[in-house]
Amino acid sequence: MRYHVVLFALAARLRFAHAQDIATQAWPSPTPGVFSIPNFSFDSGETLDSLDIHYQTLGKLEISDDGRTNAVHIMHGSIARGDQLLTEEFAGSLFNAGQILDADKYFIILRDGIGHGNSSGPRNTGLHARFPSYQYNDMVRADHQLLTEHLGVNHTRLVMGVSMGGMHTWMWGEMYPDFMDALMPIASLPVEIAGHNRLWRKTFIDLIRSDPAWENGEYASQPLVSLLGAMGLLQVMFQGQELMQREYPTRNQADNFFAQSFEAVLAHPDDYDVNDQIYAWNASWSYDPEPELEKIRVPLTAVNTADDLMNPPQLGILEKLVHDRMVRGLGRAVVVPTSNATFGHGSYIKASLWVDELASLLDQTIIPRVARG
């Protein structure tokens, strides 16, 4: 199944494509776990008695005498979860034997961020709209606690992420600059969410909150009218213009595509819980790594695609900030040209588009590890 066919329907993508990929996977089966953080304090001043972070790992952790490890921390996108990355398009290009992140050589960490997947969030805690208003900073801090306090990782070989996870990657480089050998943010920009990107997110949130069926977050069933409207907006933002015109060149084809997408949502509406989505999209409100980019101390390769409506290359933001605000020589900005292989923002899931850049980054940052005696 082509990834873009279900675009925003990440749960549907996981239900169908993930099941097929697992049946033919060559990478090791992941080991799941849960880390419970007591009395987690959010930047909003709110606290949660117990914050559960669900995670999966592949491979075995190896720690050298100098504290360096073979750990690779990879972060998913908004309204997704770690399973998003266990597909043939992603894991099948990275984690198999002999590939760049061979799971027999690396300890790969895939967590569900706060409010996503099986980690604590508005829906699965029963708190609904009373769940603490988390921001990206909270998510990164919780990840750091997961790695250091639970998994025993105090230094990683690589921190990388896609979309929201890409934004978190910039933050990791600033908040914990000595924690990794290399950074690779994908499908993101190191600048606050403003302009067009903020407007569509705010429209998405306000559309749901203005629906009487939302009932201030205490609905008994998903408010379908606003849910479908919001997901339609996300559909438009997620796809590439060239791809949409190429594959749906007539009015009827475009309408049918939208109808099929809506059917995927209506078949499993709880997979798109609107409280979870409101929180997830609002979590970017305080994101703004630009002022502290000079804090990044390790090589970084940022990759976007030319047909990404969420991170439009014509703004020139990525190249300018990497060149002007980062320590000279540490950053590299890459924009993958539009092609039949790209499909807008969601192109990040197709690791074949950027795996060569990852290989180059890892080669650049090889640091001899001191073996334990």
Residue ranges of each PLM-predicted region?
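Catalytic-loop region of hydrolases
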Residues: 18-74, 78, 82-84, 88, ...
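Conserved acidic catalytic loop of the alpha/beta-hydrolase fold
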Residues: 137-158, 171, 175
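Active-site nucleophile loop of the alpha/beta-hydrolase fold
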Residues: 113, 184-194
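Catalytic active-site module of serine/aspartate enzymes centered on a nucleophile-bearing elbow/loop
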Residues: 326-373
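Conserved alpha/beta-hydrolase "acid-adjacent" motif
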Residues: 309-317
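N-terminal cap/lid subdomain of alpha/beta-hydrolase-fold enzymes
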Residues: 56-125, 317
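Gly/Ala-rich beta-loop-alpha elbow adjacent to hydrolase catalytic centers
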Residues: 161-165, 169
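Alpha/beta-hydrolase
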Residues: 25-26, 197-198, 203-306, 310
